[in-house]
Swiss-Prot record:
This is Elongation factor P. The modification N6-(3,6-diaminohexanoyl)-5-hydroxylysine is found at residue 34. The lineage of its organism: Bacteria, Pseudomonadati, Pseudomonadota, Gammaproteobacteria, Chromatiales. It is found in: Cytoplasm. HAMAP family: EF_P. Pathway: Protein biosynthesis; polypeptide chain elongation. Gene3D superfamilies: 2.30.30.30, Nucleic acid-binding proteins (2.40.50.140).
Length: 189
């Protein structure tokens, strides 16, 4: 199995540690004035979601995690599991709440998302960077509202609440950045 040396550590790298797959969130190289250099690493367990801090001596290595990132289509949720399907093979997967996490507020049925699979089980479901969602509830706009004004909360079709400019009305389609949860623009029809 391939491995990664501390010099190859970077954010997003998937590694195996203590029998579990982890992803590197942060990596800081430290060279003290006296003594050996080391890497201070923040890792997230892909199975449990727990975040841990570890230090590795310069030159240490970790085994590469045998995880696959693939594009799957979100089909539906039955309350306990989110069901996903491969558009090529039509193979279906069930992801639990821990794997989906905050992605639930950005995913609607038939959306394509990036799924991290380990031993055939979904560990992490990531929505696309930008999604187009419909406004289902917001305060009515008042005459004279411009883009330079303030903002108001708007509820989207998935239940997510985002801050939008005052001129946005119910029924409009909005482009949302899922990484920050912020309004980007009105969607082009």
């Amino acid at each position: 199995m391939a491995g990664y040396s501390t010099s190859e550590f970077k954010s997003g790298l998937k590694v195996m540690m203590d029998g579990d797959p982890y992803t590197i969130m942060e990596n800081e190289f430290v060279k003290p004035g006296k003594g050996q250099a080391f890497n201070r690493v923040k890792l997230r367990n892909l199975k449990t979601g727990r975040v841990i801090d570890r230090t590795f001596k310069s030159g240490d290595s970790l085994e590469a995690a045998d995880v696959i990132e693939t594009q799957l289509q979100y089909l539906y949720s039955d309350g306990e599991f989110w069901h996903l399907m491969s558009p090529e093979t039509y193979e279906q997967y069930s992801a639990d709440a821990a794997a989906v996490g905050d992605s639930t507020k950005w995913l609607k049925e038939q959306d394509t998302c990036t799924v991290t699979l380990w031993n055939g089980a979904p560990l992490l479901v990531s929505p696309p960077n930008f999604v187009t969602l419909k406004v289902t509830e917001t305060d009515p706009g008042i005459r004279g509202d411009t883009s330079g004004g303030g903002s108001k909360p708007a509820t989207l079709e998935t239940g997510a609440v985002v801050r939008v400019p005052l001129f946005i009305d119910v029924g409009e389609m909005l482009k949302i950045d899922t990484r920050t949860g912020e309004y980007v623009e009105r969607a082009k029809e």
